[in-house]
C-alpha cells in the first residue's frame, strides 16, 4: 500500500444545527431545483460546512494506528434534476468539498528507527458546494472503505 492512509472512523461529533426546509423551486422549466438557494441545506438537512471527524491514521511500517480529530467538509448541497432530456446534457451536480484548507503534521508513535513517523492531514478551513474534484477526492456515495484501522496493533488503547 505505501504512504499514509486516512480512514474515516466516526462521522459527526455533537449534534449538527438543523435548518428549516423549503419546498422545491422551479427556476427553469427544464431544471427542478431541490432545496433553498445558494446550496444551503434544506428539509432539516445541515448545509455544507466544516464538521469535526475522527479519523484513523496509519502507515505500513508503524505497528499501531492513531485516532485524530480533524475538520472535514460535510452537509448537503443543492442538486438539480432535469425534468426533460436536454440536448446539452445533464446539469452538473455539486457536492460539499473544501473551499480552503491547510495541512497539519502528526507523528505516529511506535514506528521503527529509520522510518518517517510523520503524516500530513488536511484540515477544512471553509467548505463550498462545487463539482467534486475527482483527482483529489473520493466522490462516491459510499467511501472506498474499509472504515477501520488495519494495523495489527490496533489503537493500542487498553491492550
From Swiss-Prot:
GO biological process, one term: G protein-coupled receptor signaling pathway
Protein name: Lutropin subunit beta
Compartments, record wording: Secreted
One Gene Ontology cellular component annotation held by this UniProt entry: extracellular space
CDD domains: GHB_like
UniProt keyword annotations, A-Z: Disulfide bond, Glycoprotein, Hormone, Secreted, Signal
The family this protein is said to belong to: Belongs to the glycoprotein hormones subunit beta family.
Source taxonomy: Eukaryota, Metazoa, Chordata, Craniata, Vertebrata
SUPFAM superfamilies xref list: Cystine-knot cytokines (SSF57501)
Molecular functions per Gene Ontology: hormone activity
Signal sequence coordinates: 1-39
Assembly behavior: Heterodimer of a common alpha chain and a unique beta chain which confers biological specificity to thyrotropin, lutropin, follitropin and gonadotropin.
Annotated S-S bridges: 48-96, 62-111, 65-149, 73-127, 77-129, 132-139
Primary residence: secreted
UniProt xrefs under Gene3D superfamilies: Cystine-knot cytokines
Domain of life according to the entry: Eukaryota
Sugar attachment sites: 52
Record-linked SMART domains: GHB
PANTHER family in the cross-refs: GLYCOPROTEIN HORMONE BETA CHAIN (PTHR11515), LUTROPIN SUBUNIT BETA (PTHR11515:SF11)
Pfam families: Cys_knot (PF00007)
Function: Promotes spermatogenesis and ovulation by stimulating the testes and ovaries to synthesize steroids.
Amino acid at each position: 500500500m505505501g504512504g499514509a492512509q486516512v480512514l474515516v472512523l466516526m462521522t459527526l461529533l455533537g449534534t449538527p444545527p438543523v435548518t428549516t426546509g423549503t419546498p422545491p423551486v422551479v427556476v427553469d422549466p427544464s431544471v427542478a431545483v431541490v432545496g433553498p438557494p445558494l446550496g444551503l441545506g434544506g428539509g432539516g438537512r445541515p448545509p455544507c460546512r466544516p464538521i469535526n471527524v475522527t479519523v484513523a491514521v496509519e502507515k505500513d511500517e508503524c505497528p499501531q494506528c492513531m485516532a485524530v480529530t480533524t475538520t472535514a467538509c460535510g452537509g448537503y448541497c443543492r442538486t438539480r434534476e432535469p425534468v426533460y432530456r436536454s440536448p446539452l446534457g445533464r446539469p452538473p451536480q455539486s457536492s460539499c468539498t473544501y473551499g480552503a484548507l491547510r495541512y497539519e503534521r502528526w507523528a505516529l508513535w511506535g514506528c521503527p528507527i529509520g522510518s518517517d513517523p510523520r503524516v500530513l492531514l488536511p484540515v477544512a478551513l471553509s467548505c463550498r458546494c462545487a463539482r467534486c474534484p475527482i483527482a483529489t477526492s473520493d466522490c462516491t456515495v459510499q467511501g472506498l472503505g474499509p472504515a477501520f484501522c488495519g494495523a495489527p496493533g490496533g489503537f493500542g488503547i487498553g491492550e
